[in-house]
Amino acid sequence: MPFCHNIINISCVKNNWSNDVRASLYSLMALIILTTLVGNLIVIVSISHFKQLHTPTNWLIHSMATVDFLLGCLVMPYSMVRSAEHCWYFGEVFCKIHTSTDIMLSSASIFHLSFISIDRYYAVCDPLRYKAKINILVVCVMIFISWSVPAVFAFGMIFLELNFKGAEEIYYKHVHCRGGCSVFFSKISGVLAFMTSFYIPGSIMLCIYYRIYLIAKEQARSINDANQKLQIGLEMKNGISQSKERKAVKTLGIVMGVFLICWCPFFVCTVIDPFLHYTIPPTLNDVLIWFGYLNSTFNPMVYAFFYPWFRKALKMILFGKIFQKDSSRCKLFLESSS
């Protein structure tokens, strides 16, 4: 049986997977990391370079892309080694730094999603006062909260060792070992992490997007009723309103679906594992962590790839046109359709 540390009686057990299995895992996780880095970097470069994209909403998306890029750059590579080897080769201090950074950036990404839902609510439901309510100052506050709260929560919990408060005996007797870097939560810290990083921002997203859907549906019905009264282009207008309603439902479904599929399994296991006496296998926990990482991989696709300006910006980046003079002033969309 292979071990992670020279002193066998205190060492974590290394997995005994074949080289082919290990190589396949490395390839898959490296692909996820590369996709995360490239997708979010394109969003960062696009919004930074093109002046037409310098809007409060886009700076919020830019900040989220930065969080997701850092997650792919600073966290995922080390998690890849830990997941493939079931060992941690980078020391106990760096384990704490890595775990804190992981929790911070993952939570910050979810916080950004929550604030973007608030932005979309005012854009759809209160368009006349949208620019007054969601200005650059408000967005700066959103960005500050999205970074600072997860940072204080993550680094405070890990470095003060609050994550296994009340379960020290279980942790040091049955979980802790040399050459490992597992994320451990007690009953209290597991519930706290679930509430802070998932339930509260997730509930905000769910309630707001459901409200947006109801209002969009009501607006589509009002347009349909007006068309029936006026009897002008009824069939065409009705088709358009139904198409818009279907598109709204599809977009909101994708947003919530990706978020829930990626993060719900991990946080549910995090909150129930202490109550099940830590019977969830570490391998399953690793898989669920990577499912959560996938949310940062998909964020550029869900929140940026759907924007009309993105395809043109992507084409200009790929063909090197952003290096041309005054390319930053290029019009990516008509002002009325932004």
Swiss-Prot record:
From what superkingdom does this record's organism come?
Answer: Eukaryota
Gene3D superfamilies listed in its UniProt record: Rhodopsin 7-helix transmembrane proteins
Tell me which GO cellular component terms the UniProt record holds: endoplasmic reticulum membrane; plasma membrane
Q: Where does 2-phenylethylamine bind?
A: D102
- The record's disulfide annotation reads C4-C177, C12-C87, C95-C181
Parts of the chain that traverse the membrane: 25-45, 59-79, 98-118, 136-156, 188-208, 252-272, 287-307
| Entry keywords, A to Z | Cell membrane, Disulfide bond, Endoplasmic reticulum, G-protein coupled receptor, Glycoprotein, Membrane, Receptor, Transducer, Transmembrane, Transmembrane helix
Keyword check for Transmembrane: yes
Q: Name one Pfam family in it.
A: 7tm_1
Q: Cytoplasmic topology: which positions?
A: 46-58, 119-135, 209-251, 308-338
Q: Give any GO molecular function from the UniProt entry.
A: trace-amine receptor activity
GO biological process entries: adenylate cyclase-activating G protein-coupled receptor signaling pathway; adenylate cyclase-inhibiting G protein-coupled receptor signaling pathway; G protein-coupled receptor signaling pathway; phospholipase C-activating G protein-coupled receptor signaling pathway
Keyword Transport annotated: no
Q: Where in the cell is it found?
A: Endomembrane system; Endoplasmic reticulum membrane; Cell membrane
Classify the main location: membrane
- Which residues carry a glycan? N9, N16
**Family according to the record:** Belongs to the G-protein coupled receptor 1 family.
Concerning PANTHER family, the annotation shows:
HISTAMINE RECEPTOR-RELATED G-PROTEIN COUPLED RECEPTOR, TRACE AMINE-ASSOCIATED RECEPTOR 1
Q: What does the record give as the function of this protein?
A: Intracellular G-protein coupled receptor for trace amines, which recognizes endogenous amine-containing metabolites such as beta-phenylethylamine (beta-PEA), 3-iodothyronamine (T1AM), isoamylamine (IAA), cadaverine (CAD), cyclohexylamine (CHA), p-tyramine (p-TYR), trimethylamine (TMA), octopamine and tryptamine. Also functions as a receptor for various drugs and psychoactive substances, such as amphetamine and methamphetamine. Unresponsive to classical biogenic amines, such as epinephrine and histamine and only partially activated by dopamine and serotonin.
Designated name of the protein: Trace amine-associated receptor 1
User: Which species is this UniProt entry from?
Assistant: Macaca mulatta (Rhesus macaque)
